[in-house]
Structure formats: structure tokens, C-alpha cells
């Protein structure tokens, strides 16, 4: 009778020790997993921002092999995160300076409503600081129109890049005949 009781006691002790060890390593494993997921989220966010700015500027996407998805090395994940953060910052900086920025700002000066600026919406069928109609927005800024609504909801950079697409398509500054003339552009 003693023998089964001793065996049961030893088994219970071993089980308690095993559970104690498991609970001691569990928080570290959970923290490591949470840190990895946070890094992956940050990488994904910076990559999406980079690609969004590149798409706005009609530039090709920076390619990726998604190697971070297969890695558990936190140093490598931090490196990839910092790489994409740098790319996002550079793409954002580039997007703030469209090739004809000075010209778009001149057109904006005459097209905008004084109290509304880039968010101009006067009810005349034209939207934003460059007064784009729906057809123009659909043709040159369809993705923005779907995602954000009319041009009065777009940032100044987004409006200028959409205008830049029209310019590059061969239309030049002619969609704004009066203001472009006032600016000496046509």
C-alpha cells in the first residue's frame, strides 16, 4: 500500500515541478511572440505607407520577398522595420514635392475658395483646391475618389499629384485655362 502511495506522491511532485517550469517560461514566450507580432505589424504598416505614396506618384512599388514573415530573429525584424520606415519617410518626402509644385500652387491661389483652401467645395460641381470635376477625378485619381471621396477630402499633395497625372497625359495646364493663363503657364 505504501508503494502506490509513494509513487502517486512522486508523480504529483513531478507534475507540479513541470507546471512550475512551464508557467515560468510562458510569460517570456508570450512576450517574445507579442514583440514579434508588433514588429510584423509595424513592417506591414510602413510598407503599406511606402506603397501608397509610390502609387500616388505613379512610381513602381518597392519589391519585397516578405522574408520577415518567416523569421523569428528580433534583430532582423527590427532591421526590416527600420528599412521600411526609412523608405516610407523618403517616399512621403518625395510626394510632398511634385514636379510642378510651384505651378500647382499658383493655380490653387486662383481656384480655391478663400475660406476653404484645399478643402474647397462650393457646390459648383468642382472640388478641392484645384477645382477638379468628378470626371477629372475619376480619370486621374480614381483610387483616391473611391477611398477618400471627392478631391476636397484629399491632401494638397494628393491633389497636386492627380493634377500632375493629367499634365503628364498630355493635357498640360489646359484643364485650368483661365487660372493657368493668369499664372503665365499657357
Which residues does each PLM region occupy?
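Generic intrinsically disordered, low-complexity segments enriched for polar/acidic and small residues
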Residues: 8, 43, 50, 63, ...
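Intrinsically disordered, low-complexity
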Residues: 19-109, 180-186
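Peptidoglycan cell-wall recognition and remodeling modules
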Residues: 93-186
